[in-house]
């Protein structure tokens, strides 16, 4: 008996007739079997009595005893290949609404459909119908084109709302549910990169709805490349991929919400609990009008499906490898995709966990998902409907049922196929042998759509749509709020990182006691050279601390970002959710640094505290924005410190502590591009150490003659002992004037700059880095 329901497992239950009685046994199904509304224990025979009801999925069977027939045929209880929905006619209606909400004329109960999604309206002047999108999250499409305004409808136009297809017939509609009936066809895929290297060689596949497909092969065979090409996330540059006979590459946005993709690395934050991770994913992926109750129910359903309910409150990093992979799958199942692609989902799992994962994927396929899995493990490959074997270089060596693969290759174990593919023939020879085989005819040619069947004439490959093409999803502000909450929650959970962020400023502040002492800015006993070096050190420290704090913020979650970006994520709210947290840390760190300056050097005085605080905060923020840029361009977290070091070198050399006169025009130009130059010069002017020198340009008033000893307040100009005669006074004056002249020649440009203008430059640097971060992330969309 075949029950066509996605909640029914592939082998769900068994009925046995023994000694005049019927006995039912649940075969370890995913969603269980109920007898008289009570779930029976799996793998334990349960006797049935006349009148008992058996509930499996949405089907309820009632036992009625009748005379035993001599033969029982196989019974097929199924819905059509595409489930046709009952929809009202347009006749006599001025408008008809489509959406998830119960008050719509056509109710589509799917998580990716908005509450009020679209409306069909009759025009008063000619009676024709138009369709308009009602601000839905995932868009309304007509014949594959996004509806951006009122659009006239014509006979046989196909309207797509989520996974539902509505065909317009004047005065009538025909609606079909494709959510659990998505087929995938690949037609002569080739992926040419670099200098003509082809990673996929003329691969053609025909995958039917609800099939579980494994893609296996030797290392370097192009398994992940094939998966990416089939999913459309990194398209092949020759050939086509069809979803229900519609070109995926040129209609990517049409099927975007129906594609689930789980990369090799987990796409979840390890610091969150299972429920929190799925809840944040649901907030970002589900329509903006999804209520908290609906969101909670969707998360709960996914937890139940993946058998994660018992560990929903556990932190993900404390789960086993298999459980972590299930959470990653759960993030994709929230959108209830019809196609699910998994890259090495069983990699690194122990045999028991690997077997459980394969059974889980088998059950998901039985529930209506078409699943493609890249894997090295072949132990449980018999659970798959079809298996793809790739030879080295992207050659298709076999596609068909796993049970037939052993005979096809003439081996006794699946692992032996790897040796055959690498030893007996060239990859091209294996591909040619398969094209001449019965399996190729039966499982490729005959299963392809009729127009691509035996004749196999393909049209010119169409233009490829960019998977990052824009669609209006959740508003930028809403995404910013969700991401900010998630970042705060991650920090709260990751106590070690949060503690380090809070301690880095006071720990570095302790170093101030090593190079700072009270009175270095005073005319009596001060030291102008030391003051300059101290102020420069503080500028460098602020920039470095900012960079260290943020240099891994983006790259550490690159896989999560990449997946969320494909689905819903906007770049600006994502970056700003990082920036404002960095701003809070900058405000805190600047305050801590000023506290330690006060303790170590009794500086700055009260009237300079605010200006110094603003300068330090801006410098920290400029460093943090630079760190975010480093994080955005780094290929992996290990590269980030090296890039920060590369940027720090010119900040130190050309930032101002070495006099400008030692540099040529190139060095001076580099100096203008550094953050430390503008921070350092601001600090020098704010300190007032050279104010009297800047005011006395001609050295005729405060800073010349005897006035330099008694009126000028330049640090360290006054002798330790009062001159006792005219000769000592002249010597003291000469020393003071020489000191001032030397300092003025080397750093005089910093004695009286426009602090507000320098703050403006620091803000400009921050804005520039923000732009570079956004540009870097946009550039990654094209890869």
Stretch-by-stretch model annotation:
Residues 270-287:
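Q-loop/switch helix immediately C-terminal to the Walker
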Residues 332-333:
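ABC ATPase C-loop
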Residues 64, 121, 127-130, 137-138, ...:
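Topological signature of polytopic alpha-helical transporters
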Residues 1-58, 88-163:
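Forkhead-associated
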Residues 231:
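Helix-to-loop junction immediately C-terminal to a conserved catalytic motif
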Residues 279, 294-311:
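Conserved ABC ATPase "signature" region
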Residues 35-36, 142, 239-247, 255:
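Conserved ABC transporter NBD signature motif
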Residues 340-343:
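Catalytic Walker B motif of ABC-type/P-loop ATPase nucleotide-binding domains
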């Amino acid at each position: 008996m075949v029950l066509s329901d996605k909640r029914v497992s592939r082998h769900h239950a068994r009925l046995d007739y023994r000694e005049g009685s019927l006995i039912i046994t649940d075969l370890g199904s995913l969603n269980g079997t109920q007898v008289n509304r009570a779930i029976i224990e799996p793998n334990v025979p349960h006797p049935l009595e006349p009148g008992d009801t058996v509930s499996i999925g949405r089907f309820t069977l009632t036992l009625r005893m009748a005379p035993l027939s001599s033969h029982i045929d196989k019974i097929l209880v199924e819905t059509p290949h595409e489930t046709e929905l009952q929809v009202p006619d347009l006749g006599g209606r001025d408008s008809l609404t489509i959406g998830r909400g119960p008050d719509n004329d056509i109710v589509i109960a799917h998580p990716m459909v908005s509450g009020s999604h679209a409306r069909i309206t009759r025009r008063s002047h000619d009676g024709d119908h138009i369709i308009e999108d009602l601000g839905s999250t995932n868009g309304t499409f007509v014949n594959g084109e996004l509806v951006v305004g009122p659009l006239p409808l014509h006979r046989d136009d196909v309207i797509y709302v989520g996974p539902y297809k509505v065909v317009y017939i004047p005065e009538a509609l025909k609606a079909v549910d494709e959510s659990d009936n998505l087929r995938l066809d690949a037609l002569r895929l080739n992926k040419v990169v670099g200098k003509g290297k082809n990673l996929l060689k003329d691969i053609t596949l025909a995958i039917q709805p609800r099939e579980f497909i494994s893609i296996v092969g030797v290392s370097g065979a192009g398994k992940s490349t094939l998966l990416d090409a089939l999913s459309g996330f990194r398209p092949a540059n020759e050939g086509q991929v069809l979803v229900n006979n519609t070109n995926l590459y040129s209609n990517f946005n049409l099927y975007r919400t129906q594609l689930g993709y789980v990369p090799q690395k987990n796409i979840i934050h390890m610091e969150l609990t299972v429920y929190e991770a799925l809840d944040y994913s649901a907030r970002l992926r589900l329509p903006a009008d999804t209520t908290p109750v609906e969101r909670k129910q969707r998360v709960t359903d996914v937890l139940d499906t993946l058998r994660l309910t018992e560990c929903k409150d556990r932190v993900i990093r404390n789960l086993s490898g298999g459980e972590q992979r299930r959470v990653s799958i759960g993030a994709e199942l929230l959108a209830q995709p019809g196609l699910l692609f998994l890259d090495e989902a069983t990699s690194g799992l122990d045999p028991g966990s690997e077997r459980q994962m394969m059974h889980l994927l088998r059950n998901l396929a039985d529930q209506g998902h078409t699943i493609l899995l890249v894997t090295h493990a072949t132990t449980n490959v018999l659970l798959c409907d079809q298996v793809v074997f790739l030879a080295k270089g992207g050659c298709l060596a076999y596609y068909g049922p796993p049970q037939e693969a052993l005979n096809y290759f003439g081996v006794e174990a699946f692992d032996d196929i790897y040796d055959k593919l690498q030893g007996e023939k060239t990859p091209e020879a294996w591909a040619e042998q398969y094209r001449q085989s019965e399996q190729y005819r039966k499982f490729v040619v005959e299963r392809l759509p009729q127009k691509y069947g035996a004749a196999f004439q393909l049209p010119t490959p169409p233009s490829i749509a960019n998977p990052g093409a824009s669609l209006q999803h959740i508003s930028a502000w809403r995404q910013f709020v969700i991401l900010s909450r998630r970042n705060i929650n991650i920090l709260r959970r990751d106590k070690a990182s949060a503690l380090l962020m809070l301690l880095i400023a006071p720990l570095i502040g302790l170093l101030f006691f090593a190079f700072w002492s009270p009175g270095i800015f005073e005319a009596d006993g001060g030291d102008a050279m030391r003051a300059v070096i101290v102020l420069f050190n503080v500028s460098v420290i602020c920039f470095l601390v900012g960079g260290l704090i943020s240099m891994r913020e983006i790259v550490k979650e690159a896989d999560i970002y990449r997946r969320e970006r494909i689905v819903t994520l906007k770049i600006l709210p994502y970056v700003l959710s990082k920036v404002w947290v960095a701003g809070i840390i900058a405000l805190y760190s600047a305050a801590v640094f000023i506290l330690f300056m006060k303790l170590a050097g009794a500086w700055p005085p009260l009237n300079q505290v605010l200006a110094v605080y603003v300068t330090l905060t801006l410098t920290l923020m400029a460093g943090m924005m630079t760190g975010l840029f480093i994080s955005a361009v780094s290929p992996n977290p290990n590269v980030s410190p090296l890039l920060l070091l590369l940027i720090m070198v010119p900040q130190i050399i050309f930032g101002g502590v070495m006099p400008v006169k030692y540099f040529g025009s190139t060095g001076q130009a580099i100096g203008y591009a550094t953050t430390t130059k503008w921070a350092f010069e601001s600090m020098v002017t704010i300190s007032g150490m050279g104010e009297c020198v800047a005011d006395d340009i001609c050295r005729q008033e405060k800073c010349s003659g005897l006035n330099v000893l008694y009126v000028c307040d330049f640090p360290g100009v006054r002798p330790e002992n009062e001159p006792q005669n005219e000769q000592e006074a002249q010597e003291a004056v000469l020393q003071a004037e020489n000191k001032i002249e030397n300092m003025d020649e080397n750093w005089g440009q910093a004695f009286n700059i426009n602090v507000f203008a320098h703050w403006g430059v620091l803000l400009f640097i921050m804005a520039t880095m923000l732009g570079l971060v956004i540009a870097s992330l946009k550039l990654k969309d094209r890869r």
